[in-house]
């Protein structure tokens, strides 16, 4: 049987990294097995669902390059793929399961269930115990005469229910640990516990890979599957695999209130798809015990849901950034340069359309910072000074505080030496040789003392791309203007 997996989020809020990790594992398993990845939307909660959130989920998957074979936006043989558009399908199946006796009417309210338990000397919170399974027609008519409408419950088997979880192994829910459950509200609206397995059955889903938080609903859904098999709707129960929680700081479950839970928070900071996909994959799976950095293709080739670790995975921001930096360094330099542009524009370093001169500067500068950043969001601070004029370079407070007592002497000697370098020879090798001779050999300055003030003068920062290469990019006139400006400011 060909593998068919699905990702079926509710469009509420911004995409959460745990949600996207679930999509990623489903996508990877489909690609590894040559199966199909379905993308379905569970939008039956009108009060919470939004088109904005729907658009963000689409944006997230496309940004991470997680393509789908069937589903919203692309169509397929089981359309529609939004639950809000499948009401007639659910009504037909509800009628079928009611006629077969798998679903029955239940009029008891929550208060009446509690009163029933108290009358039997039990904990009132024990829940429903199937006491309305066999209401007579007269009892139903009496309830309706009072203006009451029934919920519909699924009749569950009175036996142990076991399944082999792909991540956690054999799991058994003993008979009586779960009771007949509501599948349709009194207002005739079907619940998630009904529509989710029904859609999986109708769409031929073979493997349900989802979060650990849904483990407790699995026996109910398997019971529904048995009813669907007995009524000829499907022929099999899918395999289930429950993925581990994603934890945040302090070993607490990552909450939507935590900034790092928001996928777009990471994109805005400058994660690239390759880096973030790599790190999200590590939240429960690994390629090997001694290798954390790998390509998407390598992950797909090796991914097996049976290798997922059932223990909670902690989102480690520093490790995520480090892995992202490794992937930045794997990019072709031209690709890296192009990816920095949105961040440079957002920071006001560049204004679109980018000029040919600016592109030339970026092409020269990109290799200098590609080895030094972990996030694309760091590039405006590293490159901004190369696109500014001397008068607009602001000296940062920590950079000014780092200047040694003899900074003025170093600047003056540098200006004098660099003025003698011919324009035709203005390249980083000649610049470095000239400054080392003037400051290190002649004045006896240590390199850190000699070159630190020059870095501050050029960039306004203590940390910048390589000094001599930066001077070469800026050109002789602009370099001297910046050195003179700081020298004058120091008096």
Swiss-Prot record:
GO terms for molecular function: ATP binding; glutamate-tRNA ligase activity; tRNA binding; zinc ion binding. GO terms for cellular component: cytosol. Disulfide bonds: none annotated. Gene3D superfamilies: 1.10.10.350, Glutamate-tRNA synthetase, class I, anticodon-binding domain 1, Glutamyl-trna Synthetase, Domain 2, Glutamyl-tRNA Synthetase, Domain 3, HUPs. A motif ('KMSKS' region) lies at residues 253-257. It catalyses: tRNA(Glu) + L-glutamate + ATP = L-glutamyl-tRNA(Glu) + AMP + diphosphate. Its main location: cytoplasm. GO terms for biological process: glutamyl-tRNA aminoacylation. Its EC number is 6.1.1.17. Keywords: Aminoacyl-tRNA synthetase, ATP-binding, Cytoplasm, Ligase, Nucleotide-binding, Protein biosynthesis. The keyword GTP-binding does not apply. It is found in: Cytoplasm. A motif ('HIGH' region) lies at residues 9-19. InterPro entries: aa-tRNA-synth_I_cd-bd, aa-tRNA-synth_I_codon-bd_sub2, aa_tRNA-synth_I_cd-bd_sf, Glu-tRNA-ligase_bac/mito, Glu-tRNA-synth_I_codon-bd_sub1, Glu/Gln-tRNA-synth, Glu/Gln-tRNA-synth_Ib_cat-dom, Glu_tRNA_lig_a-bdl. ATP binds at residue 256. HAMAP family: Glu_tRNA_synth_type1 (MF_00022). Catalyzes the attachment of glutamate to tRNA(Glu) in a two-step reaction: glutamate is first activated by ATP to form Glu-AMP and then transferred to the acceptor end of tRNA(Glu). Monomer. Belongs to the class-I aminoacyl-tRNA synthetase family. Glutamate--tRNA ligase type 1 subfamily. This is Glutamate--tRNA ligase.
